[in-house]
């Protein structure tokens, strides 16, 4: 891997790996090597959930469990992590197999999001829970400052449904138009048709549910609600 690119990434992350092999593994998609990042992703997913849950618990002492769960879901969902990955220019650092490279895997939201979680797992193994917690909180500083309890934290499908019901309009329809990849690493493409929109909006994700949520979010943006 290009050391200039890797050093640039570590500066953006705010962390330099002692064990560079952990960084390399975190950046390796299963299409590129048998020593890929999925176990690190599993670990990072759990650590991220704990760190964000704890941060919300400390910041919002009077907010109930339901609102905290919705805020956490907003902060750790795939499109938030993919957005963060793009801020780190993570796409240019990924190790992908030829097929994924050809199909633009370095832009795929699910791959970017999974890699952020794998990096969190790698940082934890390279250091300790205190270090990874401080790093995650630094990544999330502005997002934690901006988030607040309330209806905005409901998932996009729920918000879209409530918006349409409030105006006595038909519910949206979701149609799977494409499924790419192997069973262990699929990408779903969904068309969401909303009453009053000439064209369906498109969402992609690593599961049908995630793709539907992404499509609903695009619909909310087009409707001027987001």
Swiss-Prot record:
Chief place of localization: cytoplasm
Gene Ontology biological process terms in this record: mRNA processing; regulation of gene expression; rRNA processing; tRNA processing
UniProt domain DRBM: residue ranges: 155-225
Binding site for Mg(2+): 41, 114, 117
Cofactor entry: Mg(2+)
GO molecular function ontology, one term from the record: ribonuclease III activity
Reactions listed under catalytic activity: Endonucleolytic cleavage to 5'-phosphomonoester
EC code(s) of this entry: 3.1.26.3
Function: Digests double-stranded RNA. Involved in the processing of primary rRNA transcript to yield the immediate precursors to the large and small rRNAs (23S and 16S). Processes some mRNAs, and tRNAs when they are encoded in the rRNA operon. Processes pre-crRNA and tracrRNA of type II CRISPR loci if present in the organism.
Subunit comment: Homodimer.
Official protein name in the record: Ribonuclease 3
Species of origin: Erwinia tasmaniensis (strain DSM 17950 / CFBP 7177 / CIP 109463 / NCPPB 4357 / Et1/99)
